[in-house]
Amino acid sequence: MQYDHLLVRYGELTLKGTNRKMFVNQLKDNVKRALIPLSGYHVKGKRDRMYIELSPEADINEIIQRLSKVYGIKSISPVIKIDKNEEKINQSAIQLSHDFEKGSTFKVDVKRVDKSFRLDTYELQRQVGGAILKENNNITVNVKNPDYEIKIEVRMDAIYIYEKVIAGAGGLPVGTGGKTLLMLSGGIDSPVAGIEVMKRGVTVEAIHFHSPPFTSEKAKDKVIELTRILAERVGPIKLHLVPFTEIQKQINKVVHPRYTMTSTRRMMMRISDKVVHQINANAIVNGENLGQVASQTLKSMYAINHVTATPVLRPLLTLDKEDIIKKAKELGTFETSIQPYEDCCTIFTPKNPVTEPDFDKVIKYESVFNFDEMIENAVENIETLTIDQNYKSAKEQSTDSLIKDLF
C-alpha cells in the first residue's frame, strides 16, 4: 500500500492551554531533528495534530521508527489523503482491504469533523463497507471485535483513510521542561532515570566521574555509548567527563573506610552542583533507588544531599529493580549497562559501608583535609563531549581510519 502522509497524534501537550503553540513548535523542531538525514518528507505542525507529507522515495518504515522514539507523540498512522470524492474514498478503502488476511473480519469507523459533507457518519460507513465486500469476498464484517479497522476522518481540508495506529513514546516534547544534569554512572539505573525525566519534556546534560588508571578506557566508552543511545531519542547530549582519581585517593587516605562511599558521593554532588550552575540547569538527576545499596538509604541521601541546595530528582526512587531492568531493556540500554567494566563507585567500595551514616562523623572525617582546591581543579579539567546518535568513540574512529587507509 502506498501511503502519502503520516498522521502524528500529540500526547499530553493536548492538555496545554495558552502555551500549546510553544509545545507544538518544540515538538515540530524535535521531529525534524529526529529525521535528519532522511529525505522525502515535509513536516506540517498544526494545533491538534501533525502531518508528515511523504514523497514516493521516502523510507516510511525508518521515518516511523524514528518518530516512535520522539517524546510528545502519542501515536502515528500511515494515511492516504484524498479529496472529498465518494468514489475515491471507496477505492482507497478497497486498496487497504487487499492487505487483510483471507477469512479475517473488519469494520469501518468514521469521524466526521466536516459536518457539511454530504453523507453522515452511518451512511459513509455503510457505503464504504459495502464497496469493500463487493470487491473482496474473502473477508466479512464484525463491528464488535474486528481483526482490522478501516478509519476514515472527514476533515475540513481533506479526507484521511488509514488502518494502523502505531504507539508513540508519549510524554512531553523535550525542551519544554527546563534543564537537568544527569549523574550517569554506567550502571542500569541512571540511563533509565535520564529517560524518565526526558519524557517529561526536560533537556538533559550528563556528568560522569572516571578515575584512570583505576577505571579503564572501556568504562569511559561504555558511558559514551549509553549517552549515544539516549541521544537516539532526544538529539545531541553533552557529556561532561570529570577526572576524579586524585579526589578518590585522598578520600581513602583521610576518611574512615566505612564512610568512604558517603564522602565519595558527597564530592560528586559538590562537583555536579558547580556544573549545574555553569550550564544553567535547574536540577540534578540520578538513578538512586531507595534501599538498593548502602548509599541509597534515607540517612545516606540526607548526608549526601547536604552539600547542595540544588534540587535532586530521583525518578526511580520507589521502583522495584525488576521494573527498572524491564525499562532498561525496552530502551535498549540494558546490554550496554551490564558490560563488566568497573566505574569509580565500585573500585574503592569498602567491604562494610555504613548504611546509616552519622552526619557529624561525615563532617569530622572530611574536615581533616580541605577538598575545595581538588574540586575546583576537577571542574576546570572536565572534558565535554557532544554525543549524537551517530557518535563514534576515539577507538572506533581510529579503526575506521585504518580500514579506509587499507582500502
Curated annotation (Swiss-Prot):
One function term, GO molecular function aspect: tRNA binding
- Which keywords describe this protein according to UniProt? ATP-binding, Cytoplasm, Nucleotide-binding, RNA-binding, Thiamine biosynthesis, Transferase, tRNA-binding
Q: Tell me the route in metabolism or biology where this protein functions.
A: Cofactor biosynthesis; thiamine diphosphate biosynthesis
The domain of life is Bacteria
Instruction: Identify the main location.
Output: cytoplasm
Compartments it resides in: Cytoplasm
Q: Please name the NCBIfam families in this protein's record.
A: tRNA uracil 4-sulfurtransferase ThiI
- The protein here is known as Probable tRNA sulfurtransferase
User: What organism does the record attribute this protein to?
Assistant: Staphylococcus epidermidis (strain ATCC 35984 / DSM 28319 / BCRC 17069 / CCUG 31568 / BM 3577 / RP62A)
Taxonomically, what lineage is the organism?
Answer: Bacteria, Bacillati, Bacillota, Bacilli, Bacillales
